[in-house]
């Protein structure tokens, strides 16, 4: 029971070790007297890497290994010379400086640890589905939650964050640092128009930024290892201060919070955000926090900028009414099942049901699937893009008719193989009787793509509306609004239905988009509910 192991760092702790600058990893008072005796820690004790300068400067290779073992460590990591280290320890054992009990103590602890993890009955790791086993969705969700709760708003003048009134904002993005900020920019663009701006000359950059009323700066540094440089260059500091002096700036640092130590004054920055890492997740979440799709709750883990911002500091911002982005499993859905949508979309394009598709799935305020397929037209000159804008139409079919049908199918009230003649007996004697619900919804019902109903309301000579069909005022006889100050007579819906009933079916059974089934489905749903 209890903690299985600890690692002792190469720290200088004068209150526990009297020798000047002596590393804790070689200190018997710290490891044996305090950790093992006073605190009664019985787990494995690891050294930090013995090739690090924090310890290697205190002795020669091999001798360091001996000192580490004598101090009370069980496992010595990254010895500079394993062979010499073993020789030193063995000589000390044979000379009596290391007792049998001391050696056996560590050996038994190591053997017990191996037994605990099953190495006494070793079985190779099963590599089948290894990537899926290691890339668990619950781990992704946990990492996202940790990052979201860590990201810290250090400064937020005039409640700049979250960014509101987007119609009044003209926003530029300036990238700094030596690592990529592509994910950050891509996520920012999901909320509004963002213009990336760059120039090799500071004066040129300042001129370009004059047309914008908000500048988002992303400082991106590699975090592939902890030893990568994380600071601003002198040039970047000059540019940063000049941009902030002439523009409203939101600075985002995707690096250690200590990066901000180099900034002498924050007076010209509207907001400052620390993202801690330059990972994909950190960039995505930071962008969402800027626009209020997610709240900011993070606090600084260290004091920075000469304690101007202390440990525990951090402004909290509210979530506003905007969609966030995340994993399907975070809202109770499956990414594996959603991946099947790719096949459906690709099939529709390959079969020329449509030249292109943009598909988005959102649940509980979170977008969990968003992909583009194909092109704008069959000529394939322009690919579908996330930045495309669409005319929104035909919403009644998907917002009213389809959900009601889905509910009826789900509870077993209707079946996708039910025929129109059975759903609506009045169509039993028509050529539409045997059309199934599945065929109607998938546009394989052999119905005409459309029927120009409006033509029967126009004068055949003048091509103008016939007065008996329309009125400028709404009434019981004319209740259907067509346009401003134009209302259609109520009984014209009977004409529409009769035209559909009388229409011929297409000879070939293949995909043909048609609105006509939804006239039937409207009748059915109104009769059912």
Regions found by a protein language model. Give the residues of each.
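Short acidic, glycine-rich surface-loop motifs adjacent to enzyme active sites
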Residues: 2-22, 49, 212-227
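Hydrophobic faces of well-ordered beta-strands that scaffold small-molecule active sites
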Residues: 6-8, 43-50, 76-77, 110, ...
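Alpha-helix-loop-beta-strand connector modules within alpha/beta enzyme cores
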Residues: 24-46
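Preference for extracellular/luminal or secreted protein segments
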Residues: 28, 37-38, 58-330, 334
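Beta-lactamase-like hydrolase cores
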Residues: 329-364, 471, 476, 494, ...
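Active-site-proximal loop and beta-strand segments within enzyme catalytic domains
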Residues: 363, 378-514
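Short beta->alpha transition motifs characteristic of CBS
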Residues: 368-377
